[in-house]
Amino acid sequence: MSKLLLILALAVLAQCALVAGDKPKDNFIRLG
């Protein structure tokens, strides 16, 4: 259970890091 949440968190953080210099707000909207 914890592993799934950890993987999801890492994926989100990785994507945020990749799009940090582009448009993080749009990225969050897409995820949400």
UniProtKB/Swiss-Prot annotation:
* UniProt KW keywords: Amidation, Secreted, Signal, Toxin
Say which domain of life the source belongs to: Eukaryota
- Where found, per UniProt? Secreted
Q: Does the keyword Iron-sulfur apply?
A: no
Q: Which residues carry this modification: Leucine amide?
A: L31
Q: Which residues form the signal peptide?
A: 1-21
What would you give as a GO molecular function for this chain, any one?
toxin activity
What is the tissue localization of expression for this protein? Expressed by the venom secretory cell of the spine. The spine is a cuticular structure containing a single large nucleated venom-secreting cell at its base. It is an independent unit capable of producing, storing and injecting venom. On the back of A.stimulea caterpillars, spines are grouped together by 50 to 100 to form scoli, of which there are eight.
Q: Name one GO cellular component term.
A: extracellular region
Q: Report if keyword Protein transport is assigned.
A: no
Q: Which family does it belong to?
A: Belongs to the FARP (FMRFamide related peptide) family.
Function text: Is toxic when injected into Drosophila melanogaster. Also shows a low anthelmintic activity against the parasitic nematode H.contortus (drug susceptible Kirby isolate).
Other observations noted = Negative results: has no effect on human neuropeptide FF receptor 1 (NPFFR1), NPFFR2 and kisspeptin receptor 1 (KISS1R). Has no effect on ASIC1a and ASIC1b channels.
Q: What is this protein called?
A: U-limacoditoxin(13)-As2
Q: Which organism is it from?
A: Acharia stimulea (Saddleback caterpillar moth)
